[in-house]
């Protein structure tokens, strides 16, 4: 695809200098080489190539072109191709900006500013081409029925100059995009280096551990088992000693708690007996007094009842 496109561009550049009635010398060979050098097949470059191919057709100034120039079809086609080119260019720029994330902010801002300037120049020159064609269409319409040979020659000259400017703009844009891409590659390499620096100590530690395990694997199995048994025995003895010490501490604490509880129970019993004796000393006089009063009241009631039941003397005797 790239070879076919390069061949198409060479053919286009070779025919861009043709006039309608008089032959014109072809473009210099260095300019052809310049275009084929930067043409790398990126989507935005392919879109720009389609724009140039359409411009080459316009530069022939054939009868069909002249008829379509009197309408708005040519400018509409150029507008579509311009929009397509700028859209692909923005997409490619966004892709490179994502790859530039590891690069320093200052560097990324500078590269982005330079690329935007080159992109703006390319867009302005493409707009200039369309403006020239619109101007030519207006002049042709104003000169209907008159000779337009001089006007066509002037338009052809303007279009050749604009094509050279577009070629320079595209070359500059391609170079800046290459710088952009190189910056993205450099940032990615720095990110990989940083990861390598962080992982280096971990890899070294793993290597040391592997060497230690390898040296242990070289010992006889019986010696390693004996060493592990001794370490396990020492560990078990240490745990047993700590457990016994802890049990002794718990026993002492339980004995202390029991003694405190017995002491508190005895104190509570003594306090209850004292309180009971105090209550008894308070209420016994009251009870005895109430008993005496009750006995006196009972005697009075009995005396009153006996007096009311005595026989009354009769007056009939």
UniProtKB/Swiss-Prot annotation:
Residues 210-290 are annotated as: Lipid-binding and lipoprotein association. Residues 266-317 are annotated as: Homooligomerization. Its main location: secreted. GO terms for biological process: AMPA glutamate receptor clustering; amyloid precursor protein metabolic process; artery morphogenesis; cellular response to lipoprotein particle stimulus; cholesterol catabolic process; cholesterol efflux; cholesterol homeostasis; chylomicron remnant clearance. The keyword Repeat applies. APOE exists as multiple glycosylated and sialylated glycoforms within cells and in plasma. The extent of glycosylation and sialylation are tissue and context specific. Glycated in plasma VLDL. The modification Phosphoserine is found at residue 147. APOE is an apolipoprotein, a protein associating with lipid particles, that mainly functions in lipoprotein-mediated lipid transport between organs via the plasma and interstitial fluids. APOE is a core component of plasma lipoproteins and is involved in their production, conversion and clearance. Apolipoproteins are amphipathic molecules that interact both with lipids of the lipoprotein particle core and the aqueous environment of the plasma. Belongs to the apolipoprotein A1/A4/E family. This is Apolipoprotein E. It comes from Rhinopithecus roxellana (Golden snub-nosed monkey). The gene is APOE.
């Amino acid at each position: 695809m790239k070879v076919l496109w390069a061949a198409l561009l060479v053919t286009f550049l070779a025919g861009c200098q043709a006039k309608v009635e008089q032959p014109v010398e072809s473009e210099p060979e260095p300019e052809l080489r310049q275009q084929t050098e930067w043409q790398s097949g990126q989507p935005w470059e392919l879109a720009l190539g389609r724009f140039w191919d359409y411009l080459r057709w316009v530069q022939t100034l054939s009868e069909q072109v002249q008829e379509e120039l009197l309408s708005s079809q040519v400018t509409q086609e150029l507008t579509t191709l311009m929009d397509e080119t700028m859209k692909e260019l923005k997409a490619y720029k966004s892709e490179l900006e994502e790859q530039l994330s590891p690069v320093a902010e200052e560097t990324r801002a500078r590269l982005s500013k330079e690329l935007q300037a080159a992109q703006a120049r390319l867009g302005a020159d493409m707009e200039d081409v369309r403006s020239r064609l619109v101007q030519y269409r207006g002049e042709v319409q104003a000169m209907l029925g008159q000779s337009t040979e001089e006007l066509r020659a002037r338009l052809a000259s303007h279009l050749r100059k604009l094509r050279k400017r577009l070629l320079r703009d595209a070359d500059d844009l391609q170079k800046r995009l290459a710088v952009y891409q190189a910056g993205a590659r450099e940032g990615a390499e720095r990110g990989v280096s940083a990861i390598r620096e962080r992982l280096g100590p971990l890899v070294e530690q793993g290597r040391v551990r592997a060497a230690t395990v390898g040296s242990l694997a070289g010992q006889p199995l019986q010696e390693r088992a004996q060493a592990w048994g001794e370490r396990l025995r020492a560990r078990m003895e240490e745990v047993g000693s700590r457990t016994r010490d802890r049990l002794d501490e718990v026993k002492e604490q339980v004995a202390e708690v029991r003694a405190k509880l017995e002491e508190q129970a005895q104190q509570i019993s003594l306090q209850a007996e004292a309180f009971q004796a105090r209550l008894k000393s308070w209420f016994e006089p009251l009870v005895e007094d109430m008993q005496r009063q009750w006995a006196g009241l009972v005697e009075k009631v009995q005396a009153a009842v006996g007096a009311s039941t005595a026989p009354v003397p009769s007056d009939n005797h």
